[in-house]
Amino acid sequence: MNYINLPTVLPGSPSKTRGQIQVILGPMFSGKSTELMRRVRRFQIAQNKCLVIKYAKDTRYSSSFSTHDRNTMDALPACLLRDVAQEALGAAVIGIDEGQFFPDIVEFCEVMANAGKTVIVAALDGTFQRKAFGSILNLVPLAESVVKLTAVCMECFREAAYTKRLGLEKEVEVIGGADKYHSVCRVCYFKKSSVQPAGPDNKENCPVLGQPGEASAVRKLFAPQQVLQHNSTN
């Protein structure tokens, strides 16, 4: 029987590993970090060299990368991703937690993916004001895979797509857990929290009305009924 000797690298096959960008988005408490950890561990089991990068200003769990339920994984802290570029080039798989905090997230991920790395990013897609968080959404058109997770509303237990701040801080970057934030649904997002002041100064969680007179018009609808009840009692 004659055997055919095939070349080790077939013609037309890539000469190096193809890189890719995977993005995991969602509100707080939606399991983004847990999903990032799960994906990285799959690559570790397959004997790939992995590096996880965490935001250095988040010191709640020391130097480890951690989920809210305290599952941990070794991580390299950084404030700018370019500061850990050399370490990243030595890994096949790069996981980035809290990607919304890194100002150079888009450039870093594109460079690493073009260098053949698998880059997995977990990040908030929106701020507590439901606005784009930093430049993270600019990563979406560059990514091969994008997933948006939902949480459970911590006020009514329905599906939650938003993050609601409980305190009065105005800064976008305020690190905290359930003591500072709730994952909420659309209805509960607009409900006033007991720690939030009512009035015109609290614009973060206020719905936008179609016409300026809508709010007063609603109150007028109930005026005749209130007058009738008052007359009947007299």
UniProtKB/Swiss-Prot annotation:
Which residues are responsible for catalysis? E98 (proton acceptor)
Q: Which reaction does it catalyse?
A: thymidine + ATP = dTMP + ADP + H(+)
Source organism superkingdom: Eukaryota
Q: Which InterPro entries match?
A: P-loop_NTPase, Thymidine_kinase, Thymidine_kinase_CS
Where does the protein end up? Cytoplasm
Please tell me which stretches of this chain the record labels as motif KEN box. Answer: 203-205
PTM details? Phosphorylated on Ser-13 in mitosis. Phosphorylation of Ser-13 by CDK1 during mitosis reduces homotetramerization and catalytic efficiency when DNA replication is complete and intracellular TK1 is still present at a high level.
Q: Which SUPFAM superfamilies does the record match to this protein?
A: Glucocorticoid receptor-like (DNA-binding domain) (SSF57716), P-loop containing nucleoside triphosphate hydrolases (SSF52540)
GO terms of biological process kind: DNA synthesis involved in mitotic DNA replication; protein homotetramerization; thymidine biosynthetic process; thymidine metabolic process
One Gene Ontology cellular component: nucleus
Positions of modified residues (Phosphoserine): S13
Its EC number is 2.7.1.21
Q: What Pfam families is this protein classified in?
A: TK
* Record key words, sorted: ATP-binding, Cytoplasm, DNA synthesis, Kinase, Metal-binding, Nucleotide-binding, Phosphoprotein, Transferase, Ubl conjugation, Zinc
A molecular function annotated in GO for this UniProt entry is: zinc ion binding
Cystine pairs annotated here are none
Instruction: Kindly list the positions annotated as binding Zn(2+).
Output: C153, C156, C185, C188
**Which residues does the annotation say bind substrate?**
F128, V172, E173, V174, I175, G176, Y181
Binding residues for ATP: 26-33, 58-60, 97-100
UniProt similarity note:
Belongs to the thymidine kinase family.
Role noted for this protein: Cell-cycle-regulated enzyme of importance in nucleotide metabolism. Catalyzes the first enzymatic step in the salvage pathway converting thymidine into thymidine monophosphate. Transcriptional regulation limits expression to the S phase of the cell cycle and transient expression coincides with the oscillation in the intracellular dTTP concentration.
Further information in the entry reads: Two forms have been identified in animal cells, one in cytosol and one in mitochondria. Activity of the cytosolic enzyme is high in proliferating cells and peaks during the S-phase of the cell cycle; it is very low in resting cells.
Q: What is known of its domains?
A: KEN box sequence located in the C-terminal region is required for its mitotic degradation by the APC/C-FZR1 ubiquitin ligase and interaction capability with FZR1.
Could you describe the subunit structure of this protein? Answer: Homotetramer. Tetramerization from dimerization is induced by ATP and increases catalytic efficiency due to a high affinity for thymidine. Tetramerization is inhibited by phosphorylation at Ser-13. Interacts (via the KEN box) with FZR1.
Q: What is this protein called?
A: Thymidine kinase, cytosolic
Species, as recorded: Cricetulus griseus (Chinese hamster)
Gene name tied to this protein = TK1
